[in-house]
Amino acid sequence: MQHPREENSIVVELEPSLATFIKQGFNNLVKWPLLNIGIVLSNTSTAVNEEWLTAVEHIPTMKIFYKHIHKILTREMGFLVYLKRSQSERDNYITLYDFDYYIIDKDTNSVTMVDKPTELKETLLHVFQEYRLKSSQTIELIAFSSGTVINEDIVSKLTFLDVEVFNREYNNVKTIIDPDFVSRSPFIVISPMGKLTFFVEVYSWFDFKSCFKDIIDFLEGALIANIHNHMIKVGDCDETVSSYNPESGMLFVNDLMTMNIVNFFGCNSRLESYHRFDMTKVDVELFIKALSDACKKILSASNRL
């Protein structure tokens, strides 16, 4: 029988500066939102609100919203989770299967429930204290993915809860919710000496290869866009930005993209340092082709899992 979760690694050998470029791009651009906009609506459990919200914030939601990876990474979509659970004599614990999961279309604020895998029943979140008929413990909470704008329109779509209670509790906590986009990388990625390695988790209930392709396609597109938008100052080097003086042939490297690209074409640069280098050796389109070829190689390696 296939195990519901397996740890694997995807490894490709690349030119070292290109491998570093992809690793750094992944860590900086592939951001999966956390559920940091949390509101407890009712809580008679022994765990305080902050404990519930911390536990929920880090639920591994990518394995639930796997059909929407690309639009979540581009922030066209967000998501929310909702839990309303009362302790009973027979059921004295909460698993991830007890939550309801919804995708949010940010253009329309539509809220759509998604199917949840039965395997989530195996992931324990909380155990109630001993059951007592006259003091049964309950918890009701909702948490939105980071970056979700809470307004009247989206609240009106939350037909599964008491809107008056939601508005009251949200107003109590909204000033302490981090307004910045809070996220994590889906995988750990390293690139020692050009050995680009993705440490991944594969689950039995969805096609990981398709999801991984969505992530790599997003990464490739974002990196190419950043390359096209990147500028190196031409003229006197002032040590505030990457700059090149064609008269002296001196290059000052002040950002990771410049460092990785010029190193790909033979420079041995480091951040915040000067190097004598002929910038006419740099062919941006050639670098982009190498990047695209590397992404194809990564996907080919993932297909062997």
UniProtKB/Swiss-Prot annotation:
One GO CC term on file: virion component
Gene Ontology molecular function, alphabetical: DNA binding; DNA-directed RNA polymerase activity
Predominant location category: virion
Record's keyword terms, sorted: DNA-directed RNA polymerase, Nucleotidyltransferase, Transcription, Transferase, Virion
Catalyzed reaction equations: RNA(n) + a ribonucleoside 5'-triphosphate = RNA(n+1) + diphosphate
Gene Ontology BP term (one): viral transcription
Subcellular location per the Swiss-Prot or TrEMBL entry: Virion
Keyword Heme attributed: no
UniProt EC number: 2.7.7.6
Top-level taxon of origin: Viruses
Function in brief: Part of the DNA-dependent RNA polymerase which catalyzes the transcription of viral DNA into RNA using the four ribonucleoside triphosphates as substrates. Responsible for the transcription of early, intermediate and late genes. DNA-dependent RNA polymerase associates with the early transcription factor (ETF) thereby allowing the early genes transcription. Late transcription, and probably also intermediate transcription, require newly synthesized RNA polymerase.
Entry's family note: Belongs to the poxviridae DNA-directed RNA polymerase 35 kDa subunit family.
Known partners and oligomeric status: The DNA-dependent RNA polymerase used for intermediate and late genes expression consists of eight subunits 147 kDa, 133 kDa, 35 kDa, 30 kDa, 22 kDa, 19 kDa, 18 kDa and 7 kDa totalling more than 500 kDa in mass. The same holoenzyme, with the addition of the transcription-specificity factor RAP94, is used for early gene expression.
Protein name in the entry: DNA-directed RNA polymerase 35 kDa subunit
Gene name of this polypeptide: RPO35
